[in-house]
């Protein structure tokens, strides 16, 4: 159970998983332990999980999902009444000073469950970093004070259930966050979510007997990107046989944040020792001067090497085609060290991973960050890599619907 005694009557007393906890204010009074021990409380556990897109661009909207669940193992008093979720959006970001450059809950937007718009209340943290919860009460019947950063948003989402028990399945609540175009690339902006019950284990809602309950706060650190890479190949099912008879192509795509300009962009593809480079099919950059100079080229007779291009500038549209590099290759039978990629007579396999990266110069429109910055792609982004399996023999199986192509129905004739 994630809920603790101290966070039932004061949200300020609970600790997010990776945040510092502010001191209690005079209005945030924990209840004496003996009163809690006299009643069966905390049985209804409000557990949440928070996920969002990890590689979102400056100025983009991010789709978040909060998964709410009652994970109580108590066999009796385990029902929570009037469930809700508190979401804190880091609207201010790096401010003060202005402008705000974080992630906001867009004006006029709402949270939803299964396509149903939910009742959503927005409260702005005041100059003291306090927000009065719209309905949660403490043991004295007073509104719960939620602590946060002055100017950030508290978004309270009421779930469409009168009660919620541990036998009910987890539910997903969807909402959107808008990343400021003035945000700093690769800087973590924390979005948090906390589950709760307006009435702990009693539908009557007498505040002196049944005040609000809160679960553990979950943090999702969102790191906006100036640009993101996407690496693909036309190998069927991510596998190929070795040798020059089985040629394929890699495609390296880059999306640059809308309206942002990257200068002196260097795009690099590092070929593994098992991959033999053949030739470039196409190279392009939005608003780049052509021809785009090649700064490094792999050998066409020996596997491995580095393929690089230098773009004087790229103006972003947010499309994956802001930059595109396509080149042909095959998996050699022997690697750059003269060793068999797949030893003869073994009939084995080998996983081969190809990596791409990019570095460029960029100046923010945010007056608080006037200095030109060197920005690099996220090396841990799995989308900038492509893994394939080399085999001595690679087989694929497909089919064609001869009766209703594209609209399969029972009884159709299928050709494999």
Predicted regions and their residues:
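Subset of Sec-pathway N-terminal targeting signals
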Residues: 1-44
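Exported/extracytosolic protein signature
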Residues: 43-416
């Amino acid at each position: 159970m994630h809920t603790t005694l101290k966070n039932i009557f004061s949200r300020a007393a609970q600790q997010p998983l990776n945040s510092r906890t502010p001191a209690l204010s005079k209005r945030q009074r924990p209840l004496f332990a003996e009163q809690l021990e006299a009643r069966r409380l905390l049985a209804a556990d409000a557990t949440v999980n928070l996920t969002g897109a990890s590689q979102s661009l400056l100025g983009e909207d991010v789709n978040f999902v909060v998964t709410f669940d009652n994970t109580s193992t108590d066999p009796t008093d385990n029902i929570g009444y009037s469930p809700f979720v508190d979401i804190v959006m880091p609207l201010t970001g790096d401010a003060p000073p202005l402008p705000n450059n974080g992630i906001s809950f867009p004006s006029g937007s709402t949270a939803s469950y299964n396509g149903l718009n939910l009742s959503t209340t927005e409260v702005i943290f005041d100059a003291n970093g306090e927000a009065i919860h719209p309905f949660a009460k403490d043991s004295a019947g007073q509104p719960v004070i939620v602590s946060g950063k002055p100017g950030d948003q508290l978004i309270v989402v009421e779930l469409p259930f009168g009660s919620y028990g541990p036998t009910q399945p987890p539910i997903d609540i969807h909402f959107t966050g808008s990343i400021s175009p003035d945000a700093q690339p690769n800087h973590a902006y924390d979005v948090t979510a906390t589950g709760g019950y307006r009435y702990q284990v009693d539908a009557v809602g007498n505040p002196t007997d049944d005040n609000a309950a809160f679960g553990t706060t979950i943090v999702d650190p969102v790191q906006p990107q100036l640009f993101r890479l996407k690496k693909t190949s036309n190998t069927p099912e991510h596998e190929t046989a070795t040798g020059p008879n089985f040629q394929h192509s890699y495609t390296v795509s880059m999306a640059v944040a809308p309206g942002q300009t990257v200068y002196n962009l260097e795009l690099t593809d590092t070929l593994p020792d098992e991959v033999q480079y053949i030739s470039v099919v196409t190279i392009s950059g939005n608003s780049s001067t052509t021809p785009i100079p090649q700064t490094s080229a792999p050998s066409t007779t020996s596997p491995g090497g580095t393929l690089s291009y230098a773009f004087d500038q790229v103006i972003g549209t947010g499309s994956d085609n802001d930059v595109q590099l396509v080149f042909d290759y095959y998996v050699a039978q022997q690697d750059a060290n003269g060793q068999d990629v797949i030893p003869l007579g073994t009939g084995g396999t080998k996983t081969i991973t190809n990596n791409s990266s990019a570095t460029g110069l960029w100046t923010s429109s945010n007056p608080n960050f006037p200095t030109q910055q060197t920005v690099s792609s996220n090396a841990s982004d799995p989308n900038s890599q492509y893994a394939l399996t080399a085999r001595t023999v690679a087989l694929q199986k497909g089919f064609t619907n001869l009766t209703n192509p594209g609209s399969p129905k029972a009884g159709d004739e299928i050709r494999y």
